[in-house]
Amino acid sequence: MRVLFAGTPAVAVPSLDALVEAGFDVVAVLTRPDAPIGRKRVLTPSPVAARAAELGLDVIYAAKVDDAAIEQISAAAPDVAAIVAYGGLVPPAALAIPRHGWINLHFSLLPAWRGAAPVQRSVMAGDDVTGAVTFQLEKGLDTGPVFGTLTEAVGPEDTSGQLLERLSHSGAVLLAQTLSAIETGKASAVPQAGDVSLAPKLTLEDGHLNWHHPALAIGRQARGATPEPGAWTLLDGQRVKLDPVRLRPDVEDLAPGALAFHGKSVLVGTGSHAVELTRIQPAGKKMMAAPDWARGIGSLEGVVFE
């Protein structure tokens, strides 16, 4: 079966590999154009583009699926298209090209967390279980019927990055299985059922910790925002990045945002009990262990995160 693969970030690479390893004829790879990366803003291929080049696959570069991209997709003559985090909408004209349509691997248990940041929103919401589904892409936002589902437990210390890494590999297997079922005529899709929730892309502000919130909510927010956009706070008006924090229910006498040593640990007060800082990146400096940073300051008396 001739397959068009569409994807851009690193989480899509395991799916591309899985389809190639399963023996599908990947006739083309659709990905977003090279983007400037790092402080020097060097134009860099997407992880999917780089992997496609290693595999010797034809690549279609498109920031959006416009007329030019549609022409290239049509020329590739795919029987089906598999899409994993491509980063753009697929218009009806493109949806109609493959005879089996487009099959999307989405990292949530639809209809929960429809949108661009399902794993991050799931962690922030405190879900105990999430997962991934393969579904038929259609005009609506993640609304199509579901072919396959897998579940994944959300650990108490999981960041969105760690959870997404696991789902990217288990989801790749699910995607290959779904395409195999389609190829053999054994696939069946069922309409989505259940409560709908939305997962819009995270903004920088989504990582801004509010120390008046309960510690549990702050911990979830920090884990959900890691690695991107990153958890952060303000200190003397400057943005300070933070790694995920640890809950410290044994300490309840710190005011929200106030810092203090507790043995060798650095604690911050919240709206409930304290949390322990793990690593911190002050403005203009590298990430470092929180106790090392605090010892460099000297006294933490009067030091307050905003």
From Swiss-Prot:
CDD domains: FMT_core_Met-tRNA-FMT_N (cd08646), Met_tRNA_FMT_C (cd08704). The gene is fmt. SUPFAM superfamilies: FMT C-terminal domain-like (SSF50486), Formyltransferase (SSF53328). Attaches a formyl group to the free amino group of methionyl-tRNA(fMet). The formyl group appears to play a dual role in the initiator identity of N-formylmethionyl-tRNA by promoting its recognition by IF2 and preventing the misappropriation of this tRNA by the elongation apparatus. It is an enzyme of class 2 (transferase). It catalyses: L-methionyl-tRNA(fMet) + (6R)-10-formyltetrahydrofolate = N-formyl-L-methionyl-tRNA(fMet) + (6S)-5,6,7,8-tetrahydrofolate + H(+). One of its GO terms (cellular component) is cytosol. Keywords: Protein biosynthesis, Transferase. Pfam families: Formyl_trans_C, Formyl_trans_N. This is Methionyl-tRNA formyltransferase. Belongs to the Fmt family. (6S)-5,6,7,8-tetrahydrofolate binds at S108, L109, L110, P111. InterPro entries: Fmt, Formyl_trans_C, Formyl_transf_N, Formyl_transf_N_sf, Formyl_transferase-like_C_sf, Met-tRNA-FMT_C, Met-tRNA-FMT_N. Its EC number is 2.1.2.9. One of its GO terms (molecular function) is methionyl-tRNA formyltransferase activity.
